[in-house]
């Protein structure tokens, strides 16, 4: 038994499933999860000191790579001044100024502690601002584990939502409508059925929780137009895509302006941070200036703000996103060529610094139904083969991969070589 196996056995006696977030348990691929000892640059080192090229990046935040000196130094300096005050700090003002300067659709921003808090709060704000109860989300999109968002479609796209987790009351779920990602007709039908009841649409601009599915050209502009037509707010969940697909987020890359934006992951530089913001008129409905309540003991934590400010300062430097996209292109093109050489049907989707692998005979993957037709069993085999070759992919066929600025062309060449070897064995 290696150390990861020993630690996992102990963890299962103390922590539900042995992990503090379900996907880490490797249930999607089988086997024992890696317990990580340390990380540096593009590499993870497990408890047995095995090194892996990392394409998970802590599920997105580590866009600069692990243990980046600017972030590390900022955290150390902030910690020397105190860990938490429960009072406003200058760094909160600086962070808010930086975020709103980078994302033009955000006139004001409120800091929270996670992406789930950001989406949950944005939806509450949208409901309070509009005086409406229903929201629209999309099949295959994940916006955190708030009750109103753990909802699946019913027998049809317009069926009132049904909970997909025990513990979520049906009365909560019925206010959530689930439509088809990249299908505007399903969204229009929902609005026409409930024209005065829908407070907001919430959408991942690139669906990163059914692997990686970018929007079709007319999808996001079409959602914006429908919200305007029916008086609903347009919420873009950039927890995963923010500062990764483009500096101002996927919304700038795809040319749409939301009413509210949710942020997380990169905004904290590896620390637990979320944020939501948008139009001044809407944001001023939040307490203490307005009636919509939202609060948090650790919101705006000085350590987290220091890490986030350092990270965004680096990310905002010229050429960063061009480099990130070029590295992702190199990986995607290399994987496709390697798969073709071994007669393995593969689709690779990408958007900026994120990507997704789909074992499928289809020419493209554009929606949840396409994703569900992919060969999950083949992915499981591929995942473990790549792990043996020292490459750490997301341990699920339904999670996106992430590039960092710490990856080198040589790291990517090594990854492609490993993939071709694994493809030859599938």
From Swiss-Prot:
GO cellular component terms attached to this protein's record: cytoplasm
UniProt cross-references to Pfam families, sorted A to Z: Aminotran_3
Cofactor(s), names only, from the UniProt record: pyridoxal 5'-phosphate
GO biological process: protoporphyrinogen IX biosynthetic process
Major localization listed first in the record, in broad terms: cytoplasm
Disulfide bond positions: none
Catalytic activity, EC: 5.4.3.8
GO molecular function, a single term: transaminase activity
Reaction catalysed by this enzyme: (S)-4-amino-5-oxopentanoate = 5-aminolevulinate
Name the record gives this protein: Glutamate-1-semialdehyde 2,1-aminomutase
Organism this protein belongs to: Pectobacterium carotovorum subsp. carotovorum (strain PC1)
Gene: hemL
């Amino acid at each position: 038994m290696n150390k990861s196996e020993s630690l996992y056995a102990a963890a299962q006696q103390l922590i539900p499933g042995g992990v503090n977030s379900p996907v880490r348990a490797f249930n999607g691929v089988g086997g024992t999860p890696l317990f990580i000892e340390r990380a540096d640059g593009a590499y993870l080192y497990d408890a047995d000191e095995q090194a892996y090229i990392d394409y998970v990046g802590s599920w997105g935040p580590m866009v600069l790579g692990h243990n980046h000196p600017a972030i590390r130094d900022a955290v150390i300096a902030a910690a020397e001044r105190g860990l938490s005050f429960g009072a406003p700090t200058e760094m909160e003002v600086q962070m808010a100024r930086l975020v709103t300067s980078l994302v033009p659709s955000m006139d004001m921003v409120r800091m929270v502690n996670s992406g789930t808090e950001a989406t949950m709060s944005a939806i509450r704000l949208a409901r309070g601002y509009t005086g409406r109860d229903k929201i629209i989300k999309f099949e295959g999109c994940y916006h955190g584990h708030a009750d109103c968002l753990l909802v699946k479609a019913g027998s049809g796209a317009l069926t009132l939502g049904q909970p997909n987790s025990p513990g979520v009351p049906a009365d909560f779920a019925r206010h959530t409508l689930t439509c088809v990602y990249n299908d505007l007709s399903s969204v229009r039908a929902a609005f026409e059925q409930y024209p005065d009841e829908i407070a907001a649409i919430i959408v991942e601009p690139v669906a990163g929780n059914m692997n990686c599915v970018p929007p079709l050209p007319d999808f996001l502009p079409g959602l914006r137009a429908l919200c305007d037509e029916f008086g609903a707010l347009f919420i873009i969940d950039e927890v995963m895509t923010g500062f990764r697909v483009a500096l101002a987020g996927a919304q700038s890359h795809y040319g749409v302006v939301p009413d509210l934006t949710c942020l997380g992951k990169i905004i904290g530089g590896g620390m637990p941070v979320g944020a939501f913001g948008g139009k001044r008129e809407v944001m001023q409905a939040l307490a203490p200036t307005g009636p919509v309540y939202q609060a948090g003991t650790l919101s705006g934590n000085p350590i987290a703000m220091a890490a986030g400010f350092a990270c965004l300062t680096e990310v905002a430097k010229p050429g960063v996103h061009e480099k990130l996209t070029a590295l992702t292109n190199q990986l995607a093109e290399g994987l496709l060529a390697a798969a073709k050489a071994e007669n393995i049907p593969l689709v690779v989707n990408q958007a900026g610094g994120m990507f997704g692998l789909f074992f499928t005979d289809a020419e493209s993957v554009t929606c949840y139904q396409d994703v569900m037709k992919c060969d999950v069993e083949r992915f499981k085999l591929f995942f473990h083969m790549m792990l043996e070759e020292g490459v750490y992919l997301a341990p699920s066929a339904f999670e996106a991969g992430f590039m960092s600025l710490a990856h080198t062309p040589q790291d990517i060449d090594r990854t492609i070589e490993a993939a071709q070897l694994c493809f030859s064995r599938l």
